[in-house]
Amino acid sequence: LLQKALSLEGELNDIFLRMIKNDYMMIQQIIQGKYTQRKQKGRSSYFKRRTPKESELKSLNHSEKYIYDFIRMLSDPYPNAFIKIGKSKITFKSARFEGNNLKVEGEIN
């Protein structure tokens, strides 16, 4: 078992880039034999593929932090976060904090 800490700050692409960097460094450690073998404890976890329906934000009655995390973790290549308002659907592309304000980019369909 080889593990490395991973920050979950930033957008999904930022996290993926850090994962790739960590993976590369761990692969180098394995190739060079610089790791300690030990059996993994606990049970394996399996998750089904996320469906677009699971990306729906049912309401805006959540904290800004919750909405920020929901949108940023559902950016491409995953089905983007969206909310339905009347007959319109707003699909969120990104979210960020500017000072104390949550800013989002989206498309109205």
Predicted regions and their residues:
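Active-site-proximal loop/hinge segments within enzyme catalytic domains
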Residues: L1-K103
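Generic C-terminus detector
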Residues: K103, E107-N109
